UniProtKB/Swiss-Prot annotation:
SUPFAM superfamilies: Release factor. Belongs to the prokaryotic/mitochondrial release factor family. This is Peptide chain release factor 1. Methylated by PrmC. Methylation increases the termination efficiency of RF1. It is found in: Cytoplasm. Keywords: Cytoplasm, Methylation, Protein biosynthesis. One of its GO terms (molecular function) is translation release factor activity, codon specific. GO terms for cellular component: cytoplasm. Its main location: cytoplasm. HAMAP family: Rel_fac_1. It comes from Legionella pneumophila subsp. pneumophila (strain Philadelphia 1 / ATCC 33152 / DSM 7513). Gene3D superfamilies: 3.30.160.20, 3.30.70.1660, 6.10.140.1950. It comes from the Bacteria. The modification N5-methylglutamine is found at residue 237.
Length: 362
């Protein structure tokens, strides 16, 4: 472990012990605001501090065992030799846990997300691939126990979607899917291709963390134009009898959102407003990320949807993620929702990137 990281851990442990002492003082207990604030800090410091204490204890054990190896007592030396590998492995595991604890936490990691998949270049084939991508994300979401809620969909003429937007809710959704924003390129032989030639088309994916109602973005009602229209698509006899679908335009930015999934106009309006707030906040965050990217390139990227991040080559059964030069020959598994094959290496690389930054700045 780097000296700079060990120094940071030592400071955190000292602060943890100090806060523990403060919480037992009568003056702190009497002040509810201060007590609440310190209790929160103590809870945040506790996991990493306890882990660091275990790490220090294991290192002390290793030092003691190394001394016993030099002992004249052969039984003690043999016992030390048997235990030393176990303790070394324990230190390695604790070291890994500590590094994970030190990684700065993304405040959005626990949030639900809005997923947008749009067909790009490639016409009908791009729309079909957009449908395949949405199915892949849906399968992955189901495997994680997440809920998927359709917001709006524009169907392709020969299957798939020109655009589809859905909300995915569950535990730490953004932390898993935040690496998916960007351009996804597909190389395959379309079903309509009689010559067997490989075509290249593309889709763009956007992952936006849901706006927290507590930290709501303020929208002036005068800045909105709200239109109602009749839903299209599945819905049986109810379809086209009422103008239940909603389109909201944010006039200053030109951002347009639609929702046609619910039969109730009120519900569609609420969903559309939630999506609009998320889009506006996402635009602001993307702008900030682009400014930050001038000094440091991040694996999550700038949020630029035109940035090509991945290629899906069906004839070769190959997926390539261009950001970390990752190539996997398990494309069919991934398209069936086994997205962890891609997400896990991306997360490891991202965490390594954050740790390297941490070491440089401390």
């Amino acid at each position: 472990m780097k000296k700079s990281l060990e120094l940071k851990l030592q400071q955190m442990l000292e602060r943890y012990e100090e806060v523990g002492r403060l919480l037992s003082e009568a003056s702190i207990i009497a002040d509810q605001n201060q007590f609440k604030s310190l209790s929160k800090e103590y809870a945040q410091l506790e996991p990493v501090s306890q882990c660091y204490e275990s790490y220090l204890e294991a290192k002390n054990n290793l030092d003691s065992l190394n001394e016993l190896l030099e002992s004249d007592d052969k039984d003690l030396a043999t016992m030390a030799e048997e235990e030393i590998d176990t303790v070394k492995k324990q230190i390695e595991e604790l070291d890994e846990q500590l590094q994970w604890h030190l990684i700065p936490k993304d405040p959005d990691d626990e949030r639900n997300i809005y997923l947008e998949v749009r067909a790009g270049t490639g016409g009908d084939e791009a729309a079909i691939f957009a449908g395949d991508l949405f199915r892949m994300y849906s399968r992955y979401a189901e495997s994680q126990g997440w809920q998927i809620e359709l917001i709006s969909a524009s169907h392709g003429e020969h299957g798939g979607y020109k655009e589809i937007i859905a909300k995915i809710s569950g535990q730490a959704v953004y932390s898993q899917l935040k690496f998916e924003s960007g351009a996804h390129r597909v190389q395959r032989v379309p079903e309509t291709e009689s010559q067997g030639r490989v075509h290249t088309s593309a889709c763009t994916v956007a992952i936006m963390p849901e706006v927290d109602e507590i930290n709501d973005i303020q929208i002036n009602p005068d800045d909105l134009r709200i239109d109602t229209y009749r839903s299209s698509g599945a819905g049986g006899q109810h379809v086209n009898k009422t103008d239940s679908a909603i389109r909201i335009t944010h006039i200053p930015t030109g951002v347009v959102v639609e929702c046609q999934d619910e039969r109730s106009q009120h519900k569609n309006r609420a969903k559309a407003m939630s999506l609009l707030k998320t889009r506006l906040l996402d635009a602001e965050v993307s702008k900030q990320k682009q400014e930050q990217a001038q000094t440091r390139k991040s694996l999550v990227g700038t949020g630029d949807r035109s940035e090509r991040i991945r290629t899906y080559n069906f004839p070769q059964g190959r997926l390539t993620d261009h950001r970390i030069n990752l190539t996997i020959y398990q494309l069919s598994d991934i398209m069936e929702g086994n997205l962890s094959l891609v997400i896990d290496p991306l997360k490891r690389e991202y965490h390594a990137e954050l740790l390297a930054d941490l070491g440089r700045h401390d």
